[in-house]
Amino acid sequence: MANTIQNNRSSVDFGFHLPPPADGANKEVLSVSQILLERKRSSIMERKDKIVKAENIITDWRKEVIEKVGETNLKKFHEYSKNQRRSNFGIKELSHDPDGLAKLTLAKRKARENSIDLLKNAKLEPGGLKNIHRRYAKKLDDLFSPKEPKTSRLEMLPESKVPKGVLEGKSNPWTTRRPPFDGWAWSYSWSRWGGHDPDLVSYLNAATGSVGHRSEYQNYDAGDFDGLWLEYDTSVGVWYWPPHAGPVDIWIKARCVKGRYSVWLDDEWGWSDSSTWMRGNITVNVSPSIVDEDRAESWWSHTWGNPDSTTYGSDVIAPNSVLWFHLVTSDPIPAGAWSYIKVGTYDRHTSVLNDVSTDAIMRDWWYIEEIWMDVH
């Protein structure tokens, strides 16, 4: 059990490319660029505020554990945990032993049994501590959840709901865009308490319509109050000149390459617990019509507990699945001006750990194949 609140690291980065839709369209480019920059500035300030609140939640979490366990018992647990790790769970050397892995597994299992005895001797039950851990893990996940869009209008719909003209590829009255797209944007921000910095891969490619990301968080020496909060945005965009003013009707054809989670968990002590959430979203923004970004959850996973070196994983969306997303803007776009339509992904990867080692991988990868637009 280590005090890892002091081992907090954060990173923020972003970029975008916005070529003009036509010669002399400087006003539109500057306007959309300003919107993108202001949205990022606002999200950074919001993240800064949430990190302070997260630190307060972790402090309260620690206080409640101390009140439940008592200072003397907590010191015993600390010493036991430290001695077990230093001695490699009582096994000095494994590198030249062909049975080393099996011996280590047995030694760790024995250490867990002894840790439960420590709790019982202190008149404590593992379930009591786990209830505390899960309550505070939920508080952190709620804190890290983004604000809901002011008007949530983006929907994931079956092909049967798609207009016949779109499915048949008719260009009247629709304007259709396929890769390569005009612009692109990406951003990520993460904070961790313990473990390694997350390994990140972007799938963004405006030439092919590829969006999404891969993130991996490894923490093989999880302390009392470890965790990760990661957000990753990618998008491609197109300029649109409407035939007249009015709300924009948008249909998006997207092909899912990977909507997959993989979470390895390894219990360390009888009081251990963990929760890992992964959420993938498709997003749409129409500048300047929509102030914030609309999104529809495409998949999610929640993995929890303290198993004995177990990996949980699944393709939540079958690879190569084609899904349709639909949005009609609540506000009209003006006539005689360019609007910028941005389509992509917003992913959130959160882990909260208490003495559970983990290797958690999120993959959310899509191809935006078609964007259909018409003005009502």
Where are these regions (language model features)?
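Mature extracytoplasmic or otherwise solvent-exposed domains
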Residues: 2-376
